[in-house]
């Protein structure tokens, strides 16, 4: 795995492990509710085909918190294209986690836009905020 992508994954995972999970879960589900009004969902879309990070976190807290760590690892492997450059891999990882990162910022009590911008500067990704 590319070092910069690994550093980004570890940063997000460490930030996730530092926050109170129940508060994070509530914030994530609220962010997801707001975002779902802008998502295009087609009749033939299968719920199982959606990314883990675009589904509400509703079940057992222990299961979900351990699943988040597994899904972060899986996502990093999926976007780690050997032919792609480091920047595009990190950008894909960031874009898949935009809602997740926003929920982290809210849970930490940090301005969402500023948090995204700092992440962009630190890891060289183009942020949406």
Curated annotation (Swiss-Prot):
Highest rank taxon of the organism: Bacteria
One Pfam family recorded for the sequence: Mg296
Name of the protein: Uncharacterized protein MG296 homolog
UniProt cross-references to InterPro entries, sorted A to Z: Mg296-like_C, MG296-like_sf, Mg296_protein
